[in-house]
Amino acid sequence: MENITDGKWGSLPVKLHDNILQTLKELGFTYMTPVQSACIPLFMSNKDVAAEAVTGSGKTLAFVIPALEILLKREEKLKKMQVGALIITPTRELAMQISEVMGRFLQGFPQFTQILLIGGSNPIEDVEKLKTQGANIIIATPGRLEDMFRRKADGLDLATAVKSLDVLVLDEADRLLDMGFEASLNTILGYLPKQRRTGLFSATQTQELEKLVRAGLRNPVRITVKEKGVAASSVQKTPAKLSNYYTMCRAEEKFNTLVAFLRQHKHEKQLVFFSTCACVEYFGKALEVLVKNVSIHCIHGKMKHKRNKIFADFRALKSGILVCTDVMARGIDIPEVNWVLQYDPPSSASSFVHRCGRTARIGNQGNALVFLLPMEESYVNFLSINQKCPLQSFSSVKDVVDVLPKLKAMALGDRAMFEKGMRAFVSYVQAYAKHECSLIFRIKDLDFAALARGFALLRLPKMPELRGKTFPDFKAEAIDTDTIRFKDKNREKQRQKWLAEQKEKEVPLRKNFIKNKAWSKQKIKKDRKKKRLPKAKLDQDSDAAEEDLNELMNDTRLLKKLKKGKITEEDFDKQMSSTDKHKPAGIDSSDGD
């Protein structure tokens, strides 16, 4: 099904409950989006649905509304410990967002209860909440949900609770697989009844996703929703009201350009994407100092417990900056994001589309800007062809000033900042080496000296990619970096204590040093082969031991036959000597007399 047009909710071929229509009115959703008008009637008429739609097209309501309608039409009312709907999504931020939307609709249906099962919270608390309050609707991430199914020893029988399941939704299904949740999903699907309605929603279609469709859905209706007004021959994968730009700048000017842009748009809401967690930590801290009078938040995948609060705080802001990795790239709906800035291009082309989709959501206007090095210019043409995502050149950012000396001063004044910068540089280079578009993002063409200047490094780190090379264009600061102290007195005290201990022991710091090696596929294959060798040797040794045992048993049998008179001494000597001939050199079967 394609090219579904949008319209008012009353134009649907199925009737929605009055309370649902009232909530839609309160939320300001007067018109349906194409994906909603396509999916809701099919889902409500007991069809399995596999929907592909551009990011920001309103997929959440396309499954929340029919899920509620299906539960309302049940002949038997759900009991406290019966789960009627299960929604699985890849990230906790997206799960929180869906739970928030579901909560608004459940205000009109007090007979239903929901629970949010995500990482970053105490699983024991989740178990107790489920046991005492129950839940008719579960919104969860795969890891935590799988954990709950295994909590029978704690008195939670979730496997029995889901036997009443009517609706299963896999949201951002392509990313569920990308993030390695396939095994968890298969485990979860094993607990669920076959007689259910299943909806699978994604922004892209992959071969792995097709396998999941075949495994989890029964004769699904496939829906591909295209942006209104886009020709079938060139389906644009980003929202129609998104203005997509790129800007070219040298490595040492890149951060200066970003700071100037953020200063000029400080009254707007902006997302800034970096390629690694270490880059978020470093540049996020720098932006807090360099961009004044703006609320700046940082979020990345290694933050386990803080992420939920940071995400909620930023969503509530009218303006501000969220510095993040791709943990925020999919499905997250943050109100009124004006700009999505991609300081580092993502590791895959499809991620580029999803990052851009954090703005211009559900028909709103939005802008996206990617920062490219001169050597990366061909990426613009690649995106246009590969992802149907055309980019316009952005007029140069004005009032760019050199903030790198200030960044260096921050590193000189606090060892924490110095170490963050070094880690950020190393992680960036490693991420660049593993980029999916390696024909465009070539590590061998990277100007390491210019890059280090752009990171405001005091010296170059020791890493495999730089070994044996000289960089006359990079001038290290004339300072012993070991003398840079932590601003945090406790951390500095611990460092000094550690240094004193090392001196007392007089153990060379490099004694246990393991030489770093550059990442490569060939290296990984060699390592795997090495790991297999000891196992092969062990199997060989095991075979040899078994052979020795068989020979010993054979000798014992011959000796018994001799004692019982079944063979002569001559026969015995002959058979024993023939056995010795087959033994490896160095093995003596005599008694040693």
UniProtKB/Swiss-Prot annotation:
SUPFAM superfamilies: P-loop containing nucleoside triphosphate hydrolases (SSF52540). One of its GO terms (molecular function) is RNA helicase activity. PROSITE patterns: DEAD_ATP_HELICASE, HELICASE_ATP_BIND_1, HELICASE_CTER, Q_MOTIF. Residues 524-535 have a biased composition (Basic residues). InterPro entries: DEAD/DEAH_box_helicase_dom, Helicase_ATP-bd, Helicase_C-like, P-loop_NTPase, RNA-helicase_DEAD-box_CS, RNA_helicase_DEAD_Q_motif, SPB4-like_CTE. It catalyses: ATP + H2O = ADP + phosphate + H(+). Interacts with 28S rRNA. Interacts with double-stranded RNA substrates in vitro; the interaction stimulates ATPase activity. Residues 241-405 form the Helicase C-terminal domain. Probable ATP-binding RNA helicase. Plays an essential role in early embryonic development. Has ATPase activity and is involved in the maturation of precursor large subunit rRNAs. It comes from Danio rerio (Zebrafish). Residues 531-560 are annotated as: Important for nuclear localization. Keywords: ATP-binding, Coiled coil, Developmental protein, Helicase, Hydrolase, Nucleotide-binding, Nucleus, Ribosome biogenesis, RNA-binding, rRNA processing, rRNA-binding. A motif (Q motif) lies at residues 9-37. Residues 535-565 form a coiled coil. A motif (DEAD box) lies at residues 171-174. The keyword Transmembrane helix does not apply. It is an enzyme of class 3 (hydrolase). PANTHER family: RNA HELICASE. It comes from the Eukaryota. The Q motif is unique to and characteristic of the DEAD box family of RNA helicases and controls ATP binding and hydrolysis. Its main location: nucleus. It holds the Pfam family DEAD. The gene is ddx55. This is ATP-dependent RNA helicase DDX55.
